[in-house]
């Protein structure tokens, strides 16, 4: 099945501590989760490793967020939207359900 949300898509968060924020998807995981730039930041306590040149301390990194908690952002309407699929010229393409415009 084709992915409704892909890398580099602009999304809006629907639920959680970052609700309402917009950002770009940096990675789509096979478990149905996304890594989104600047969203769902967690603090990780990093142990120093001199052999690898890694300094220790508390670092902030992006944790995965469930796909169901985000929606693709439609620039034309300025709102969250749903994704549909259709065939055009023998190719499967994604489109916004609200105004039928193609995504990218």
Curated annotation (Swiss-Prot):
Assigned keywords, A-Z: Ribonucleoprotein, Ribosomal protein, RNA-binding, rRNA-binding
GO biological process, one term: translation
CDD domains referenced in this protein's UniProt entry, alphabetically: KOW_RPL26 (cd06089)
Cellular component per GO, a single term: ribosome
GO molecular function per UniProt: rRNA binding; structural constituent of ribosome
InterPro entries: KOW, Rib_uL2_dom2, Ribosomal_uL24, Ribosomal_uL24_CS, Ribosomal_uL24_KOW, Translation_prot_SH3-like_sf
Similarity comment text for this entry: Belongs to the universal ribosomal protein uL24 family.
PANTHER family registered for this protein in UniProt: MITOCHONDRIAL RIBOSOMAL PROTEIN L24 (PTHR12903)
Function as written in the Swiss-Prot or TrEMBL entry: One of two assembly initiator proteins, it binds directly to the 5'-end of the 23S rRNA, where it nucleates assembly of the 50S subunit.
NCBIfam families xref list: rplX_bact
Record-given protein name: Large ribosomal subunit protein uL24
Gene that encodes it: rplX
């Amino acid at each position: 099945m084709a992915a409704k949300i892909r890398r580099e898509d602009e999304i809006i968060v629907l639920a959680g501590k970052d609700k309402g924020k917009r950002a770009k998807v940096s990675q789509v995981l096979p478990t149905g989760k996304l890594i989104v730039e600047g969203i769902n930041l967690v603090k990780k306590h990093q142990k120093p490793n001199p052999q690898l040149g890694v300094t220790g301390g508390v670092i902030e990194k992006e944790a995965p967020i469930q796909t169901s908690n985000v929606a693709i952002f439609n620039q034309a309407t300025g709102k969250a939207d749903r994704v549909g699929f259709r065939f055009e010229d023998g190719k499967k393409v994604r489109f916004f359900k609200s105004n039928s415009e193609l995504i990218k």
